[in-house]
From Swiss-Prot:
UniProt entry keywords in alphabetical sequence: DNA damage, DNA recombination, DNA repair
UniProt xrefs under Pfam families: RecO_C, RecO_N
The keyword DNA damage belongs to this UniProt entry's keyword annotation: yes
Protein name: DNA repair protein RecO
SUPFAM superfamilies documented for this protein: ArfGap/RecO-like zinc finger, Nucleic acid-binding proteins
InterPro entries: ARFGAP/RecO (IPR037278), DNA_rep/recomb_RecO_N (IPR022572), NA-bd_OB-fold (IPR012340), RecO (IPR003717), RecO_C (IPR042242)
GO biological process: DNA recombination; double-strand break repair
Cellular compartments per GO CC: bacterial nucleoid
Cystine pairings recorded for this chain: none
Purpose: Involved in DNA repair and RecF pathway recombination.
Family to which the UniProt record says this protein belongs: Belongs to the RecO family.
Organism expressing this protein natively: Dinoroseobacter shibae (strain DSM 16493 / NCIMB 14021 / DFL 12)
Length: 241
């Protein structure tokens, strides 16, 4: 029998038989991991198994490559805290869906896990989460091998007046170097460089990360389209202007 115990974030839940569910969790040491929770539809467990929840997970299986089973205990819920905030709820749904879409099963991403927990906690608290979400998408691209290089201009090598990102290379481009290519470049708002986090700037940043999610990451994952939850979040955010 193989067994481990660790805290994790609940990414998704789906029915399995009449009384059980299959949960997908993201943990620090074991990555994105699936398992059966017996009795998961019960009055005791159903309220605990809400996407975004922080859980104490114990996983057991006879063999390493088996799906195995989870027993779960609540650490802290987050769904109730965002239910009354459509924007935060859509952001949480987007982050959970992107994690499911992108992360390799059973591969550890310890630093990115910590950043995910911090983002979800910020969403539940309702403070400072908008730039944190943009940072999270940038970190996701980096983890997947498509990180943006914003350290200096790809054309001139300078690190001043950076205003655009090359849609091909993901490298920054200065305003002066953009020239006739300016209409083909992606925006590089100040927030992506550690500047003020205005709504317009965050939306511009998400336009840029969205390009790489759709045109770089998705093709690498078998040309599956990015999750609709992200498009819904961008729509809700755009209407919040």
């Amino acid at each position: 029998m193989i067994e481990w115990r660790e805290e994790g974030v609940l990414l998704s839940v789906r029915p399995h038989g009449e009384t059980s569910v299959i949960v997908e969790a993201f943990t620090r040491a074991h990555g994105r991991h699936l398992g059966v929770v017996r009795g998961g539809v019960s009055r005791k467990l159903a309220p605990v198994l809400q996407p975004g929840a922080q859980l104490d997970l114990r996983w057991k299986a006879r063999l390493e490559d088996h799906m195995g089973a989870f027993t779960v205990e609540p650490v802290r819920g987050r769904a109730a805290a965002v239910l009354g905030d459509r924007l935060a709820l859509s952001a949480m749904s987007s982050a959970l869906a992107l994690a499911r879409f992108s992360l390799a099963e059973r591969a550890a991403y310890p630093g990115f896990y910590d950043q995910t927990v911090a983002l979800l906690d910020a969403l539940a608290e309702g403070t400072g989460w908008l730039p944190a979400y943009l940072d999270w998408e940038m970190a996701l691209l980096d983890q997947m091998g498509f990180g943006l290089d914003l350290s200096g201009c790809a054309v001139r090598g300078v690190n001043e007046d950076l205003a655009f990102v090359s849609p091909r290379t993901g490298r920054a481009v200065s305003r002066q170097a953009a020239g006739a290519w300016v209409d083909r470049l992606l925006p590089l708002p100040e927030v992506m460089l550690g500047g003020p986090a205005h709504l317009h700037g965050v939306l511009e940043g998400l336009t840029t990360t969205g390009h790489f999610l759709e045109h770089k990451l998705a093709p690498a994952l078998g040309n599956r389209p990015p999750p609709e939850a992200r498009a819904r979040f961008i729509d809700v955010l755009s209407r919040a202007r």
